[in-house]
């Protein structure tokens, strides 16, 4: 069985760095232990670096260490012409490059905390042909990919 491949946007990656117990952190730890694959885009890395430098600069080293430890695949950003040609995919034009990068990476899920632009509009997932969710919902939905079903010797 192949590992589930999750594309984390900057909100999910940021949460995974600053929280020691949240679902986003758990996803990074699963990637570190080779149970899942994490994919990021160049833009996600740059956005997250800027946000951490601005809000919690002492965590910049943690971000870089987590990206290396998780063996994250970093994909190229889409070309500007490709972004312009796909503005219809999502209402917030700044999110088009993230959506396109996830689509092109052929991931199993796009993981985000950005409910307003990605999750609350179900057409985004349909148009992009992607499953999209928060770290918490994705970790529950994807559980079957990395947790074997429980089998009891007693039949329960």
Identify the function of each model-found stretch.
Residues 108-109, 115-156:
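Acidic, PIN/NYN-like endoribonuclease modules and their adjacent C-terminal/linker elements
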Residues 42, 46-82, 98:
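Domain-scale selection of a single, long terminal region
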């Amino acid at each position: 069985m192949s590992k589930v491949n999750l594309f984390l946007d900057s909100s999910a990656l940021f949460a995974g760095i600053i929280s020691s117990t949240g679902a986003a952190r758990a996803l990074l730890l699963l990637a570190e232990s080779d149970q899942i694959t994490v994919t990021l885009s160049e833009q996600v890395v740059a956005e997250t670096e800027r946000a951490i430098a601005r809000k919690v600069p002492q965590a910049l080293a943690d971000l870089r260490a987590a990206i290396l430890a998780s063996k994250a695949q970093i994909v190229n950003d889409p070309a500007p012409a490709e972004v312009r040609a796909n503005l219809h995919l999502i209402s917030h034009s700044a999110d088009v490059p993230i959506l396109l990068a996830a689509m092109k990476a052929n991931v199993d899920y796009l993981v985000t905390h950005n409910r307003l632009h990605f999750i609350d509009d179900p057409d985004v997932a349909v148009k992009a042909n992607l499953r999209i969710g928060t770290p918490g919902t994705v970790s529950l939905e994807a559980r079957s990919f990395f947790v074997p079903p429980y089998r009891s010797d007693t039949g329960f």
